[in-house]
Amino acid sequence: MSIISAIFLLLLFAALAAIMAQVVSSSNTTAAQDVQGSRALQAAQAGVEWGLFQLDPNGDSATLPSCFATNPTVLTTISDYQVSVRCTPYPGATTTYAEGGKTLRVFEITATARATASQPLTIEREARVRVEKCRDSTITVAPFDC
């Protein structure tokens, strides 16, 4: 075997090693982003659950609840994530519906979770839910939910 073919094989193997290192590195980054994305989605879902509880925690009000905040409320208790939760009446600002002697109002709660750790890419997930709250005028004791 000549020296030229030996150098060629050495360079070929070095290039293959560099390509393999790049593939392994990118797959590790992708796996880490998948984990961060899953955690961000769970944080957003926790924000939605918090928002649902804020609407009517005990069902002890005889009147329909209102949104807890139309401007985003930022939750700081979920570590490594900034979760902002917003409530809006759906589809309009004060729309209520009457159905069979019951009064209904629909709310949309949106929670957005963003990873706060410094990363080259921003990881962000959003969860959204629409919920109907109902009051029945014939119910005279709490809980007043229909």
How should each PLM-predicted stretch be described?
Residues 29, 33, 98-100, 118:
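Residues embedded in well-ordered secondary-structure elements
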